[in-house]
Amino acid sequence: MLLLLAEYLQQFYKGFAVFQYLTLRGILGVLTALVLSLCYGPWMIRTLQNRQIGQSVRNDGPQSHLSKSGTPTMGGALILSSIGVSTLLWADLSNRYVWVVLLVTLLFGAIGWVDDYRKVIEKNSRGLPSRWKYFWQSVFGLGAAIFLYMTASTPVETTLILPMLKDYSIPLGAGFIVLTYFVIVGSSNAVNLTDGLDGLAIMPTVMVGGGLGIFCYLSGNVKFAEYLLIPYVPGAGELIVFCGALIGAGLGFLWFNTYPAQVFMGDVGALALGAALGTIAVIVRQEIVLFIMGGVFVMETLSVVIQVASFKLTGRRVFRMAPIHHHFELKGWPEPRVIVRFWIITVILVLIGLATLKLR
């Protein structure tokens, strides 16, 4: 929005041309979303408290979590609104990728909002039934996949890129739709499963979002893409503004979500942020890199799959409780230790993901 204004004002003062630079608008995206989150966070927390929109805590979980009962939830709305405003202000609104990622984020956020609303407001412990949750995730995920497939302008946009193998890639054809569906829906649910401790999900999301933002910038620049032997995706660079907004909004939310949390993001935030990461990774053709950088999300998801499969097949549980962060809590780890160690793991994995830029 402001980019259009800057383009108009250039005829009066050439200095406004500085807003054409992606790096500047990415930084402004971070700062705008951060300021919005910090400024409106206290108001949102008070509003949620006044309306008694608080978290319910399971009795069979770690006993330390009982003190969290009643903590305001659905704070993910603060993240999404900050991301949305910042992106609309600083991104090029004629870029189709910006709209795809923004719409996917908001639509998955809507699914999470309905789920949270039923749990917290209607006091329905089941929330949105799983079949309906997955149905709408599938509808929106497939919709995004089909759109990206139909609007692909080059073959590389539907090709699976294998990091560290510069001369080998897999043309997917229509299989791109299937892969994209699983990446978007899978990452959405993976972040949601991780969101079980104060700050556990949001900081890895910020880190992975920052890593993907670097890939967006490089993939959208033909010279950098050719030099680094990564796919050149025209227009993908504009997503650095969205990634910047995600980082700013996430850090602003973490200010209130850090242990002991004043607010939880709820499904409205977790489902949306996971879907955003998946969609960005698909656009820049870095699904495997997302798998690496988001290793904490993958680990949390696998722990649930293993736990359920083991119990159904043998009647025994592999972990004391799943997702795996609860397993460590029940082993006696203090919550902050679990959180920070998972953050450290994410830092390492993001660096490994970025290292694939040169290991080709």
UniProtKB/Swiss-Prot annotation:
Under Gene Ontology molecular function, one entry of this record is: phospho-N-acetylmuramoyl-pentapeptide-transferase activity
Q: Which UniProt keywords apply?
A: Cell cycle, Cell division, Cell inner membrane, Cell membrane, Cell shape, Cell wall biogenesis/degradation, Magnesium, Membrane, Metal-binding, Peptidoglycan synthesis, Transferase, Transmembrane, Transmembrane helix
PROSITE patterns in alphabetical order: MRAY_1 (PS01347), MRAY_2 (PS01348)
- Identify one Pfam family in the record: MraY_sig1
Gene Ontology cellular component terms for the protein in this record:
plasma membrane
Which coarse location class applies to the principal site listed for this UniProt protein? membrane
Q: Might you name a Gene Ontology BP term for this protein?
A: regulation of cell shape
EC number, as in UniProt: 2.7.8.13
- Spell out the InterPro entries in the cross-references: Glycosyl_transferase_4 (IPR000715), PNAcMuramoyl-5peptid_Trfase (IPR003524), PNAcMuramoyl-5peptid_Trfase_CS (IPR018480)
Q: Which sequence ranges are marked TM in the entry?
A: 16-36, 73-93, 97-117, 134-154, 168-188, 199-219, 236-256, 263-283, 288-308, 338-358
Which family is this sequence assigned to? Answer: Belongs to the glycosyltransferase 4 family. MraY subfamily.
Protein's UniProt name: Phospho-N-acetylmuramoyl-pentapeptide-transferase
